[in-house]
C-alpha cells in the first residue's frame, strides 16, 4: 500500500455504507470497501468523502488509473476535503501526468494542514519535469512545514544532482542511515559533476528489408501476436560484413509456420547497402512461433551459431561454415520444456572457455485457453494483462564441450525464482570477474542474478536496488542493456517499459548497488509517451559518450480508442550530454517497433540499427550522422577464452579520458547485436592504451593505436 495512505487508515470506525466501507478498508478488505463506497456514492453523489475513499481503495490495489476519477470528483466537490486534492496530485504523479499533478497540488494548498506533504509532492513532480530550482525550493518549503520524509528525499535529490556534501548533511539530519551509507560510499563519484556539451544531432537513413514480419493476427488478440519479433546482427559467413537474421511468427492458434510468409529470414550483406534473402539456401526457415534470437559461436569452431526462442519450442542452429545451418536442437538438449521463451543470451558463466546459454521465459500460456480480455469498452477485445497468467522460471544450460548442454537451472539457483521475463542483459556489475545476469520482468520485480562462482547464482535484485524503479514500483519492463554509459568503469543498466511508466536508468554505484537516475537524467520526462521494447547503449555520433536507442510501439493496436497515446510510435535516441543528462531525439517513421540490434553494417565507423516492425518490413537505419568523431572497432578472438571473446572487459585511454565496454551479443528485447566492440573517440586520433581483461584471466595491453580502423585482437 502507498505510504501516503497509511495516515488515513487509523481514522476509520459502522453503520452507513460510508462507515461500513471505512471499516472494511481498515481491515484491508478492499473488495467489500469498494462495494460499500460505490453504494455510498449512489446514495449521495455529492459526498466528497465517499469518492475520496473509493480512490483510496483503488490506490491501495495499485489501480492508479481507476483511482483518478474518484479523487478528481472528491477534489472538485470539496477541495477542502482532507487529502482529496493531495491524493489526486499523487495519482497524477504516479501516472506521470505532471502538469495535472501540479494543478491538483495547487488546489491541495488550500488546506493549511496539508502544506508539508503537498510541497513534497510538488517537489517530486517538478524534479521529474526538469524544473530543478523550483523543486529544490518546494523541498525546503516542505521541510519547513514539518514533513518528516521530505528531508531524506531532499538529501537524495541533492545526491542525484551531484551535490554530495550537501546531500550527506541532509541525510545525517534525517537519520537516514541506509541512504547515508550509499552516498558515503559514492563520495567523489556522484552523477552530474561534469560540464554539459550539446551532442551532435543524429541522422539515420531508413531502408526496408524484403520481408513482412507476420504475427499471424486473427482478431482474437492472442497474446503472442504483440510480442514478436527479435532480430540479430552477426557475420555468419566471416566475410567481415555483418548480416541480419529475423525471427518470425506463425499461424494461430496452431503455432505452425504454415506458409513461407511465416519463415524466419536470413539476409546476407551485399556490401553495397543492400541485403539478399538467403534463408532457403541456409536452411534456417525454422518452425513454430519464433520470438527472439541469440547469436554466438557456442562450439568454438570459428562460425557464429544461432539460438532461436519461441512458444512451446526453441531451436539451436549450428553454422556449418559453408553458408548453411544444421538444426541440432535435439542433440544439444536445449529444446526446452514447452514453455514460452522470449529471449536468450550467451555467456561463459564459469569461465571455462565455452559459452553457456541462458533462456528467458515469460509466462504460462496456451492458445487453446486464451482469455477474452476487454479494453475498458464493451464489445472490444484486447490483449490480456500479464496479471492473468502464472510466471515461469528461467533456464540455464551448461556447455558440455561436446556439442551438448546440461540443464543446470535447478542446481545453479536460477529456477528458484519465477518471473515474467522479457529481456536479458549480461555484465559484471561488481567487477569480480564473473558474469552476472539481469532479467527485465513484465509487471513483477526484475531479477539480478549475482554469479557466486562454483556454478551458483544468488538473486539480489532488491538489495541491489534494481528490482523496482526509483518510486519502488515494478514496471512493465521489456528490453535491457548492461553497459557503462558514464565512463566510470562500472556497468549500468537501462530498461524500457510501457507508456506512462518511464524508462529507468540504473547507475551502478561503487558499493555494488544501483540508483535510478531516470528523473535527473531527463530520460523520465522524455520517455513518458513511449512504450519501449528493444534498446541499446551505443555511441551513435562517435563523441566518446554512449547514447541510448529505444524501439517504440504500443503494446495494443487500438490505443487511440481508449487513451491519448498513439499505437504506432517513433523510435527515440537519448543522446548523452556528458553531464549525467540526455537529450531526446525522435526519429522519423512511426510503427509497432519491437526488436532492435546494433552493428556497423556498412563499415563506415558509425553504428547502424536494424529494427523489426509488426506486420511491416523490418528496416535498416543507416547512420549518416554528419561530422561524426573518430572511432575504433575491436574484434576479439579467444584462444584460451571462448572463441568470440564474449565477456572480455575492454578499457581504452585517450587524451580525453577513459572508456570501458564489454564483448556481448545480448541486447534489448529478444535481440542480438554484433560482437564487434565499438568506441567513439571524439577528436582523438590516437588511443594511448587498450587493455583487455579476458574471461580466462589473461590481461592484454596495446599502446599507441591509430583510430578509424577495424582491429582484430587474438588472445595471447
Q: Where are each of the predicted segments found?
A:
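Hydrophobic beta-strand segments that make up the repeating blades of beta-propeller
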Residues: 244-248, 301-310, 357-361, 437-441, ...
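Beta-propeller blade termini
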Residues: 228-238, 268, 289-304, 318, ...
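Register position in tetratricopeptide repeats
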Residues: 26-27, 60-61, 94-95, 128-129, ...
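Repeat-based blade/solenoid architectures
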Residues: 209-230, 282-294, 334-345, 390, ...
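Gly/Ser/Thr/Pro-enriched helix-cap/hinge segments flanking short amphipathic alpha-helices
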Residues: 210, 217-218, 522-525, 556, ...
Amino acid at each position: 500500500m502507498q505510504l501516503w495512505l497509511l495516515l488515513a487508515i487509523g481514522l476509520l470506525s459502522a453503520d452507513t455504507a460510508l462507515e461500513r466501507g471505512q471499516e472494511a478498508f481498515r481491515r484491508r478488505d478492499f473488495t467489500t470497501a469498494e462495494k460499500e463506497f460505490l453504494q455510498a456514492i449512489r446514495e449521495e453523489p455529492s459526498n466528497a468523502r465517499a469518492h475520496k475513499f473509493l480512490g483510496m481503495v483503488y490506490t491501495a490495489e495499485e489501480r492508479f488509473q481507476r483511482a483518478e476519477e474518484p479523487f478528481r470528483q472528491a477534489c472538485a466537490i470539496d477541495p477542502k476535503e482532507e487529502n482529496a486534492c493531495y491524493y489526486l496530485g499523487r495519482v497524477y504523479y504516479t501516472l506521470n501526468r505532471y502538469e495535472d499533478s501540479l494543478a491538483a497540488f495547487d488546489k491541495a494548498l488550500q488546506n493549511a494542514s496539508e502544506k508539508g506533504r503537498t510541497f513534497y509532492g510538488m517537489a517530486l513532480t517538478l524534479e521529474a519535469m526538469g524544473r530543478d530550482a523550483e523543486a529544490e525550493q518546494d523541498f525546503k518549503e516542505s521541510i519547513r512545514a514539518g514533513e518528516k520524509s521530505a528531508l531524506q528525499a531532499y538529501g537524495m535529490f541533492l545526491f542525484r544532482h551531484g551535490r554530495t556534501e550537501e546531500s550527506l548533511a541532509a541525510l545525517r539530519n534525517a537519520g537516514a542511515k541506509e541512504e547515508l551509507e550509499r552516498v558515503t560510499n559514492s563520495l567523489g563519484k556522484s552523477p552530474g559533476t561534469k560540464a554539459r556539451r550539446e551532442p551532435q544531432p543524429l541522422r539515420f537513413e531508413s531502408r526496408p528489408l524484403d520481408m513482412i514480419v507476420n504475427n499471424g493476427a486473427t482478431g482474437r488478440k492472442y497474446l503472442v501476436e504483440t510480442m514478436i519479433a527479435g532480430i540479430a546482427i552477426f557475420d555468419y559467413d566471416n566475410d567481415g560484413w555483418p548480416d541480419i537474421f529475423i525471427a518470425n511468427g506463425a499461424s494461430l492458434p496452431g503455432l505452425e509456420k504454415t506458409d513461407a510468409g511465416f519463415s524466419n529470414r536470413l539476409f546476407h550483406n551485399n556490401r553495397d547497402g543492400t541485403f539478399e534473402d538467403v534463408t532457403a539456401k541456409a536452411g534456417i526457415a525454422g518452425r513454430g512461433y519464433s520470438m527472439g534470437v541469440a547469436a554466438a559461436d557456442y562450439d568454438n569452431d570459428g562460425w557464429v551459431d544461432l539460438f532461436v526462442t519461441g512458444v512451446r519450442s526453441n531451436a539451436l542452429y549450428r553454422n556449418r561454415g559453408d553458408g548453411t545451418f544444421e538444426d541440432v536442437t535435439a542433440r544439444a538438449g536445449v529444446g526446452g520444456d514447452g514453455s514460452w521463451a522470449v529471449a536468450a543470451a550467451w555467456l561463459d558463466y564459469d569461465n571455462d572457455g565455452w559459452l553457456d546459454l541462458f533462456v528467458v521465459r515469460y509466462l504460462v500460456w496456451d492458445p487453446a485457453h486464451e482469455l477474452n480480455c476487454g479494453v475498458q469498452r464493451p464489445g472490444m477485445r484486447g490483449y490480456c494483462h500479464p496479471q492473468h497468467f502464472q510466471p515461469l522460471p528461467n533456464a540455464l544450460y551448461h556447455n558440455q564441450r561436446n556439442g551438448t548442454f546440461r540443464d543446470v537451472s535447478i542446481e545453479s539457483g536460477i529456477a528458484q525464482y519465477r518471473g515474467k521475463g522479457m529481456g536479458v542483459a549480461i555484465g559484471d556489475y561488481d567487477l569480480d570477474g564473473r558474469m552476472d545476469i539481469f532479467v527485465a520482468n513484465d509487471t513483477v520485480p526484475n531479477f539480478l542474478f549475482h554469479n557466486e562462482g562454483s556454478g551458483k547464482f544468488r538473486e539480489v535484485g532488491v538489495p541491489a536496488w534494481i528490482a523496482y524503479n526509483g518510486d519502488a514500483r515494478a514496471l512493465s519492463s521489456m528490453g535491457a542493456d548492461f553497459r557503462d554509459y558514464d565512463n566510470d568503469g562500472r556497468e549500468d543498466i537501462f530498461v524500457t517499459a510501457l507508456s506512462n511508466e518511464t524508462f529507468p536508468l540504473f547507475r551502478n554505484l561503487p558499493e555494488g548497488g544501483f540508483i535510478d537516475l531516470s528523473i535527473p537524467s531527463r530520460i523520465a520526462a522524455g520517455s513518458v509517451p513511449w512504450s519501449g521494447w528493444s534498446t541499446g547503449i551505443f555511441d551513435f555520433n562517435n563523441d566518446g559518450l554512449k547514447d541510448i536507442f529505444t524501439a517504440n510501439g504500443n503494446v495494443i493496436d487500438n490505443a487511440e480508442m481508449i487513451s491519448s497515446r498513439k499505437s504506432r510510435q517513433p523510435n527515440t535516441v537519448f543522446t548523452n550530454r556528458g553531464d549525467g543528462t540526455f537529450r531526446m531525439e525522435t526519429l522519423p517513421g512511426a510503427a509497432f517497433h519491437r526488436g532492435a540490434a546494433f552493428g556497423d553494417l556498412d563499415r563506415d565507423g558509425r553504428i547502424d540499427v536494424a529494427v523489426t516492425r509488426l506486420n511491416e518490413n523490418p528496416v535498416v537505419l543507416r547512420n549518416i550522422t554528419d561530422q561524426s568523431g573518430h572511432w575504433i572497432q575491436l574484434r576479439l578472438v579467444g584462444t584460451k577464452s571462448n572463441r568470440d571473446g564474449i565477456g572480455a572487459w575492454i578499457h581504452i585511454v585517450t587524451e580525453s579520458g577513459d572508456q570501458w565496454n564489454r564483448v556481448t551479443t545480448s541486447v534489448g528485447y529478444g535481440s542480438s547485436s554484433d560482437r564487434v566492440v565499438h568506441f567513439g573517440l571524439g577528436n582523438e586520433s590516437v588511443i594511448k592504451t587498450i587493455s583487455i581483461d579476458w574471461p580466462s584471466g589473461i590481461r592484454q595491453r596495446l599502446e599507441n593505436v591509430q583510430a578509424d580502423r577495424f582491429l582484430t585482437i587474438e588472445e595471447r
